[in-house]
Amino acid sequence: MRLFLVYFVILNILFSISAMAEKPYHHVYENGKFKKFRNYQGAPERNKNFKWSYKKFREAKKNINVIVPKDFVVPRKTVLENLEKYKNEDFILWINHASFIIKLGSTTIVTDLITAPNAGPLFLGPRRYTPPALELDQLPKIDLWLNSHLHYDHLSISDIRNFPYKSAKVLVPLNNGSYFKKNNFKDIKELDWFDTVQINKDLSITLTPSQHWNKRSALPFGPGATDKALWGSFLIDYKDIKIFFACDTGYSNIYKMMGKKFDGI
């Protein structure tokens, strides 16, 4: 019996070591348990002076009087007219920040949708200087939602909650899906870097690395904790067209790698 237990313990240890060895570099484990995600192997670490420089930027920003030029924003009427005019063609429409509508054949995609008045929890966080090109109730029918990470300027709970097309397919990096699931989205797929989803015979989506990080909550646990959920960019491959939605990223070795891996990007 003792001999059996010894063999059992040894096999468990060997299995755990083997399983950990198979994990990608960006999956960090500690004592056999998942700890966090990290950037692509060989990517630079964040400079220790970043917080200091960001603090100085925020202080200086308070003294800047932001004036939006009169003709800077395309009138909503023009946006809606063009949406109707080109509804049977492929197009890309910029809503704001990282929010785009991309129509490719019969599939209409939205990326990192945010139309909320502020980027933060409840009423907190930076507020808009300009309105979005479209409000939620003015969006065309969306078939596919791509979301890159959980930062408040890329994921809006009010937009998820009030989104009119809950039947849309949602593609997100690992551990990002719960925010959609809680708000009645049914078709949610979490991806690791380099996972590809075939949407139809002409369209595929691949999650690719980005040089960034993830956080949504001050709590040390759950998907909103620092780097507990993965982040990424998306490669949209449609017929002979490639669209790279880089989203939030710094420069690193990932771009040379992806240039070699994905011909024609």
What label would you give each PLM region?
Residues 1-4:
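Positively charged n-region of N-terminal signal peptides that target proteins for export
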Residues 7-15:
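Bacterial N-terminal signal peptides
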Residues 17-138, 236-247, 263-264:
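Metallo-beta-lactamase
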Residues 113-115, 150, 210-211, 247-249:
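Active-site metal-binding loops of divalent metal-dependent hydrolases
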Residues 124-172, 187, 260-265:
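Active-site metal-binding motif and surrounding structural segment of the metallo-beta-lactamase
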Residues 158, 214-265:
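Active-site-proximal loop/helix segments of hydrolase catalytic cores
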Residues 173-179, 192-194:
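Short, polar loop motifs at secondary-structure junctions
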Residues 189-191, 196-227, 239:
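Flexible, acidic/histidine-containing loops and adjacent segments that form or flank the divalent-metal
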